[in-house]
């Protein structure tokens, strides 16, 4: 049979995304088992990369529905306390951050102090970081970021996607004012996309290599972003030259994952919690005093409720990540992630807002300065009356 071309693959994938929940659930089960079987044949181990709600549900789905005995691995210390609690209840392996040259571990504050704040998006942050660190080697790329004009390597394009969105050019393009003859602003803080690498990506990848293990991921193409096209091109299971991974939920939408969450949470509340408690005691991971969470849904998400039209939603956070991550913050309605952090952990909020970094004069500063600069409200007393943070989708690019 002739291999499907890229467009045919994407069209076939999109068609599967339109199928009902029951089809997607069964499809995920089939693909998950196929991945395990193929890995077994190749002599590979496998694990679940666990973070927030989607991957927590994937872990339970693989164990309790697919019958696949697979460990969960996470950089848990980056997650919200309520997520960490669920991780502990499930026996998720916590992988520490990378070590620095001085032997200490990288922390959120150390990464941001040295490299910069993760703000807007990974793509935009990486471009701003290049502007803040000019060299002869990245001269052509910096020109493209400001003007959209690419050289021979980029096909001599005009108005290419390399150019920053005008909103971000205005705020971050000032590093090239003299070179490009423009009049943009520049902040007095650094911007970077390196946090994920130092705090969770590289260390979890290293764990995988050390254990000859490849990951199951809780990714969905419906979330969009850079991974969406890759998922639609390569499907749920991918065995490449340098990358091997499974994303059983790749064809799921938000409603599908919330339906499955309610289903898995029902299992948890009807005997599964006790099963994991006994296993944790037996393995010495928890003590008898450890209070198992009543729900698989971490408290940061609230509960899953249904609108009059039947649409499911979480009453608190819709998405989560590292508590100090600012990617996408400008797209969120208030109360946004930092507002919710103020409610759940005011001490951490205060540290992140005002004390996590020091300027050249030794004065403390934090996310409050960054959010002010990009026009996102953060003062808890202004919730409901401050909509500065709301932008359109183009601002995310």
Regions flagged by a language model, labelled:
Residues 2-256, 263:
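ATP-dependent adenylation/nucleotidyltransferase module used to activate substrates
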Residues 2-14, 42-44, 254-269, 274-397:
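ATP/NTP-dependent adenylation/nucleotidyl-transfer catalytic domains that generate, transfer
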